[in-house]
Amino acid sequence: MQKGQQTKSAIVDAALGLATQIGIEGLSIGAVAEVMQMSKSGVFAHFGSREELQISVVREYHHRFELEVFYPAMQEPRGLPRLQALFANWMKRTSAEIDSGCLYI
């Protein structure tokens, strides 16, 4: 992974953490820049707008949800075992979000 992509990934990770605390609507280039100890223009250069930053955060949130909840459940046999795994994974994720915050609340 190139340095620019590593930086962008780190920004998205920090922005996701921030968004779980303040909500996606409160997420701004300035707030993320402060957390990352970067200039606003440095963060802006990776996304081009506040909206693109927010979209990247939502995509990352959904990607992590799929990795932690959906894909592991799909390894289970069809039917009730898969449904039980999906529910168990979802509840595990939800209880972790109680401590860290949920992106949408």
What are these regions (language model features)?
Residues T7, S28, V57, V69, ...:
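Hydrophobic alpha-helical segments typical of transmembrane helices
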Residues E34, G48-S49, R59:
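Residue-level detection of the helix-turn-helix DNA-binding "recognition helix"
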Residues Q54-Y61:
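Alpha-helical DNA-contacting segments of helix-turn-helix folds
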